[in-house]
């Protein structure tokens, strides 16, 4: 007899990629194609049910499909939420939605750099700012049903691709993953974080001349940060909290948890703590744990 788990594994998987224009949908689709997804760009929402019917016929090439949908569909886009809900109710295809967004200022910068017109401003009658704000309003409904919301404001193309690969490169969607990220408050808070912890109360290696050019990834800085009693107490209390909270997030159906650790510049204290937290979570949980240091190298002009 085929059990429930085997039935789930045999189902085709559909990932709908949508979000704000300029937030990175093209990058995501290209990356998904590289890791084995059958990708379709700008499919009119009205054709989505027909496409799903093809997936249900068992074609091996349509086992994992990613479809990018945006407001170029104009009036047709209004039906997208209803179309997705209808597909989910049929229970024949696993459907997930990824929504990409970025801060307005960043979107404006990207559009000016690319010199392309916004999809809502093809006739030139709207300002770029008004086009972006209207798009945010029009997409608000689809954002509410998204499984994955990714803020690309601070992400390079390389980092965005890494996020996509971390989540979708395996044969099946990963049921739950934890992303631990360090950042610097002076460079802006991490927008897509679920939990943010401020470690600026800990002794700062920045004021030790030999340690200043290093990061928390370097052993001397790591040991300096971790040697203090207050660091150890904080770490123990934080791990107790995370061990309590994380199973609850998973139980509620959350597929990804982003934990952000912030210090002043994102170079020393937050990096060391994020590193240790990631190692500890890997030991405790049978989940995929990823560690990312957003601002560790920004002082040298390189964001890795």
From Swiss-Prot:
Binding sites annotated in the UniProt record for ATP: 19-26
Residues the record lists as binding GTP: 70-73
Keywords: ATP-binding, GTP-binding, Nucleotide-binding
InterPro entries: P-loop_NTPase, RapZ-like, RapZ-like_N, RapZ_C
Transmembrane segments: none
Pfam families: PapZ_C, RapZ-like_N
Cysteine-cysteine disulfides: none
Keyword Protein biosynthesis: no
GO terms for MF: ATP binding; GTP binding
Family the UniProt entry places it in: Belongs to the RapZ-like family.
NCBIfam families, per database record: PRK05416.1
Record-linked HAMAP family: RapZ_like (MF_00636)
Function: Displays ATPase and GTPase activities.
Protein name, UniProt field: Nucleotide-binding protein SH2124
The organism of origin for this protein: Staphylococcus haemolyticus (strain JCSC1435)
